[in-house]
Amino acid sequence: MQNYQSHSIKVLKGLEGVRKRPGMYIGDTNVGGLHHMVYEVVDNAVDESMAGFCDTINITLTDEGSCIVEDNGRGIPVDIHPTEKIPACTVVLTILHAGGKFDNDTYKVSGGLHGVGVSVVNALSKRLIMTIKKEGQIYRQEFEKGIPTSELEIIGKTKSAKESGTTIEFFPDESVMEVVEFQAGILQKRFKEMAYLNDGLKISFKEEKTQLQETYFYEDGLKQFVKDSAKKELLTPIISFKSMDEETRTSIEVALAYADDYNENTLSFVNNIKTSEGGTHEAGFKMGLSKAILQYIGNNIKTKESRPISEDIKEGLIAVVSLKMSEPLFEGQTKSKLGSSYARALVSKLVYDKIHQFLEENPNEAKIIANKALLAAKAREASKKARELTRKKDNLSVGTLPGKLADCQSKDPLESEIFLVEGDSAGGSAKQGRDRVFQAILPLKGKILNVEKSHLSKILKSEEIKNMITAFGCGIQESFDIERLRYHKIIIMTDADVDGSHIQTLLMTFFYRYLRPLIEQGHVYIAQAPLYKYKKGKTEIYLKDSVALDHFLIEHGINSVDIEGIGKNDLMNLLKVARHYRYALLELEKRYNLLEILRFLIETKDALSLDMKVLEKSILEKLEGLNYQILRSFATEESLHLHTQTPKGLVEFNLDDNLFKEVLFEEANYTYQKLMEYNLDFLENKDILAFLEEVENHAKKGANIQRYKGLGEMNPNDLWETTMHKENRSLIKLKIEDLEKTDAVFSLCMGDEVEPRRAFIQAHAKDVKQLDV
């Protein structure tokens, strides 16, 4: 084993300022920063793996709120540091920029700076425990907010002299971090990615709270990565290869395949860090791939059709490019783009040689790849011709604009906005109600084409899509120019029903796939048309959704209730909490039935700590008190099953740990505890939810509450006042927070693969909170 001792740890400077400006080190103090702390510790263990000294990493999220990261690497050095005169492991945990990665002999490649990460994590943790197994001994040291609270001490011996490794357990400090509760879903994705990129590394992940336990291990990680990334059927086998350039100490690994898809999905990494903006390695990959395939087509296929270009090679491509290099040069602090110039030539030559060889040795697969490129070229030419139809001679001339477009008078894009309105009826109301100076209206007939299932050549034949592209003025694909955008606000305005939601989704899919910069630069919005209209006498109020309606009913209903012992504002706040409690209960009832039992479990003190047999007896007594007939009841140590006859019919109820782990159950329990913080003596033993209903009924008495299904039901003035007037309206700006996750959602929900969508719907059907049928 290579010698890894205190002299390998280089020291730069102390930890001053980390707690004052944590965002400089972990990005932010919210969800992203919290999980970045985990990655920093895990990355150190992965670096041990890349150096060849670790093959197992265990990560545990504990019930106490801590994260434990354990590896079987060499263990951080414990001998006295030559310049700091304290144990080297203490230096690594307490001094910024102290780590083995500044010593080129310790780590040939690394994702970051060893010691920077773990010392920052220490500074931002209210408590951190370091345990090291090294040279037959087990060492331990504790820290609080980056400061040692104990000396490094020997607490035992290892089972064997060869056993080694480092364990870090840290508790995020809530006085610095806005969020301290880890989210398993975020971490799972990253750990799986790490296992893909490091053949033979076993990463085990456990969450004690949910008893989740997963292990990620791949013998041929990149090939599996490509296979798992494919959303549609693969047309070719997965091609994979790797190489090591000794001169630059750069390892290159590539895996790719072609799928029956129009979209490209190329992922690139440097030292396990995702380079989402690409860089020289990704450019080199595409250069080498294009050169090999285009050369093959030129030498082997005669065609009178359009010749493919590099752009055509990308259609249907799924690829992962992973580099491990000693001193990568990144552009910017985020490390999302590689700038090392020599990487382009290295990757390009390797990819060209390997793909050229594959095509020569596999004529059937070569023909499939060539035909895919030829079809893409043909479609590109058809799209080019179709695009010409959407171009105008003059960007602001109305002469070539769609006939259905009611344009605005202003020619200033900064103040101009266009409403994409569902149907001619609503379009008519919008045209009459708008401010003609700066508001344009484009009615859309029916549901537009689902672009996820269509090629661009077909998309550009769609009348509604052509009208939108022409109206926007910015073009599409390679002719796209955001400087020519005629409206800086594009507002989707649809009915508040299932069809309206579908049209919104189709439009969002179109914008995401073909006009993504409009979303990224904040030009696309969704109008929040009111769902309800409350009318009583001369009072007319428009309400956005059921929450707004309930709050309005509470605020106006209490005026008709004579209550002593509680102030009006306190009563209003209490009833809003009660409304939230009722909502959580009703959502739970959809899954578990018997609202009465759910309330009993939440509202009965210590009910959740009772033995299941004792709990069964209490529940049966409760149901019998309600005159429900118990038909069958069966309890084990862990669950209760019963059938009972209620006024609503025969009901089955199953009780086990799954109920108590439900987020909605926790929400209901939390809101009930909030209710109990109020003095409820004024109710005189009346049920709080019954009182809430009484208050709401007072507000409803003599009132007409209309639920809008369509914008066409509103007269032009109402539509203007509620949805289009800048002073009154509510708009939602579209944002893309996680590109990969967004891409996956559109592919799943809007693509032509039925089975994954069916499975998703079946898995999440009970989670639906607003179903319009």
UniProtKB/Swiss-Prot annotation:
Q: Does the keyword Nucleotide-binding apply?
A: yes
Which EC number(s) does UniProt give? 5.6.2.2
Using the UniProt record, name the top-level EC class of this enzyme in a single word.
isomerase
- Chain residues that bind Mg(2+) 1: E422, D495
Q: Which SMART domains match?
A: HATPase_c, TOP2c
> For this protein, what is any one GO molecular function term?
ATP binding
Give a Pfam family name: DNA_gyraseB
Q: What reaction does this catalyse?
A: ATP-dependent breakage, passage and rejoining of double-stranded DNA
What this protein needs as a cofactor is:
Mg(2+); Mn(2+); Ca(2+)
The record's function comment reads:
A type II topoisomerase that negatively supercoils closed circular double-stranded (ds) DNA in an ATP-dependent manner to modulate DNA topology and maintain chromosomes in an underwound state. Negative supercoiling favors strand separation, and DNA replication, transcription, recombination and repair, all of which involve strand separation. Also able to catalyze the interconversion of other topological isomers of dsDNA rings, including catenanes and knotted rings. Type II topoisomerases break and join 2 DNA strands simultaneously in an ATP-dependent manner.
> What NCBIfam families does its record include?
gyrB (TIGR01059), PRK05644.1 (NF004189), PRK14939.1 (NF011501)
Its UniProt miscellaneous note says: Few gyrases are as efficient as E.coli at forming negative supercoils. Not all organisms have 2 type II topoisomerases; in organisms with a single type II topoisomerase this enzyme also has to decatenate newly replicated chromosomes.
Recorded protein name is: DNA gyrase subunit B
Cite the source lineage: Bacteria, Pseudomonadati, Campylobacterota, Epsilonproteobacteria, Campylobacterales
Q: Which gene encodes it?
A: gyrB
